[in-house]
Every structure is written in structure tokens, then in C-alpha cells.
Amino acid sequence: MKQQQAGSKIEANKMLVQTFLGCVESGDFGEIFDEIVDENYNDHLQGQSTGRDNLKKYLMAIKTAFPDLKWPVHIIIAEGDFVAVHNQITGTHLADFGPFPASGKRVNVTAFQLYRIVEGKLAEHWELADFPALASQLQS
């Protein structure tokens, strides 16, 4: 029975991350987003501030810069409270993003995400993405 419960929790955690990625792709940062992201969300990505509201601002800026943003998932695995995702990040750069003025260019970057789930909510995030490739695609 415990193994079945653990399996159910792992599947629920994977679904939670997929729901989050769907919110980001659709730009829906409303009620569902608030229900699945912890108020004190800690994003370990360099330069990020703690908190769900700061995450919303960051993701809204990304969604504005890349309105057709997609995060197709290649692999999603989970163990305990952690969910790991290997995905692409694609989109068309139509508005300023950091130091990069809108370019109209398509980007395609590989990323690895690790999420920690606490009490049914996303609590922490680590990311390793090919940011040099992103910068190169936006500059060329």
C-alpha cells in the first residue's frame, strides 16, 4: 500500500509540474498558478528573487518578450519530493528581454529544470539552461 501511495504522490508531483509549465506557456498566472506555487517560492536561478509574486513578474516578462513561448518536455522523472524535467525553450523574440531589444528571431534552447514540491505546491526550482546559446541566437 505504501508503494502505491508513493507512486500516486510521484505522479501527482509530475502532473503539478506539467500544470505549471502549461500556465507559463498559456500566460495564465491567475488562480491555478497561485494554487500550485508556494507563496515563498525559491528560484535558485541567478538573479532571481524569492516569492511567487516575483516569479510571476519574471515569467510575465518572458511571456511578453516571447509571446509564443513553448516548453516542450522531452523527459520528466520524479523521486520523493523532486521532479526533474529535460525540455526545450522555444519562442519568437518580439519584445525587449533584458539587454536584448526585440529582434523577431526564433530561439530554441535546451534546459534542465529541477523542482521541489512541498505540501502539494512548487516550493523550489533549479535550472541549467544553455543561456550562452540563447544570447547568441538573440544577437546573431
What are the residue ranges of the model-derived segments?
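C-terminal and inter-domain tail/linker signature
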Residues: 1-140
